[in-house]
């Protein structure tokens, strides 16, 4: 059993990779990619994917018997009020109180979060007994405010949702890591396996990726690549990288070198 676990609220995860469920061609591929990733958590947009109506095709059916944790998210919500209502209804229908809080401020271009509405919703939901994983911008001050409001994990974007641009501000990932005590989960903008590895090397506790897997030419293969990248990045972070220096440093010893 791996002793280096990801702890969020009262739940413990062996995997530090979280996957999404959107943009796949069908539920079967979603399931197969998730299994290949060995992720133990999958996000589901409550407003866009049926998880509450048993009469319609249901993503939950594909994961029956698995230990994968469903993480309902509020994608599509733009205010604290509608988000709070959505999650309360979701909990009533499914019993799930482990949630990804996502409130979008710009719905047309950047899909950037509305951090003020997010902060308001976080405080209410946390007091209402939810375990809140809060999607936000890469601002260490807001990250700390969300933690103070009761968030059990902070999920700063690496780049705009679905952009595949990778981590645009590496320093802010480090600053957020230093500012909070709850897990930091890099979310949005991951485009390939190396992006996930870099996020972990910077100190992220986990990575969430959806589009990079779902829209890859081979989603199953990309899912396994993400799995390995997150593991490698975490090991690299724990091992401790060498310091960067402006000049060369010989890797072979010079003492006792033969002279000719």
Swiss-Prot record:
Active site (catalytic residues): 100 (schiff-base intermediate with dxp)
EC numbers: 2.8.1.10
Subunit relationships: Homotetramer. Forms heterodimers with either ThiH or ThiS.
UniProt subcellular location: Cytoplasm
Record function comment: Catalyzes the rearrangement of 1-deoxy-D-xylulose 5-phosphate (DXP) to produce the thiazole phosphate moiety of thiamine. Sulfur is provided by the thiocarboxylate moiety of the carrier protein ThiS. In vitro, sulfur can be provided by H(2)S.
Protein name: Thiazole synthase
InterPro entries, sorted: Aldolase_TIM, Thiazole_synthase_ThiG, ThiG
GO CC terms: cytoplasm
Stated family: Belongs to the ThiG family.
The species this protein was found in: Wolinella succinogenes (strain ATCC 29543 / DSM 1740 / CCUG 13145 / JCM 31913 / LMG 7466 / NCTC 11488 / FDC 602W) (Vibrio succinogenes)
Keyword flag Cytoplasm: yes
CDD domains assigned to the protein according to its UniProt record, in alphabetical order: ThiG
């Amino acid at each position: 059993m791996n002793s280096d676990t990801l702890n969020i609220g009262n739940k413990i995860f062996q995997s530090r990779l979280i996957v999404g469920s959107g943009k796949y061609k069908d539920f079967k591929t979603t399931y197969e990619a998730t299994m290949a990733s060995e992720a133990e958590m999958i996000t589901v947009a409550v407003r866009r994917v049926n998880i509450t109506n048993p009469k319609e095709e249901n993503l939950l059916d594909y994961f029956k018997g698995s230990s994968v944790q469903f993480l309902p998210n509020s994608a599509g919500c733009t205010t604290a009020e509608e988000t709070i209502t959505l999650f309360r209804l979701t909990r009533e229908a499914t019993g799930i109180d482990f949630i990804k809080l996502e409130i979008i401020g710009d719905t047309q271009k950047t899909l950037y979060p509305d951090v003020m509405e997010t902060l308001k919703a976080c405080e209410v939901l946390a007091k209402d007994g939810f375990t809140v994983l809060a999607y936000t911008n890469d601002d260490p001050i807001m990250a700390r405010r969300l933690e103070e409001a009761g968030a059990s994990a902070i999920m700063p974007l690496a780049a705009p949702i679905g952009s595949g641009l990778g981590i645009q501000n590496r320093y802010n990932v480090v600053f957020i890591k230093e500012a909070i005590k709850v897990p930091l989960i890099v979310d949005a903008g991951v485009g390939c396996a190396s992006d996930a590895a870099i996020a972990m090397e910077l100190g992220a506790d986990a990575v969430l990726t959806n589009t990079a897997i779902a829209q890859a030419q081979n989603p199953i293969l990309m899912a396994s690549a993400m799995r390995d990248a997150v593991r490698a990045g975490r090991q690299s972070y724990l091992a401790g990288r060498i310091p960067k220096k402006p000049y060369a440093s010989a890797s072979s010893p010079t003492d006792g070198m033969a002279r000719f």
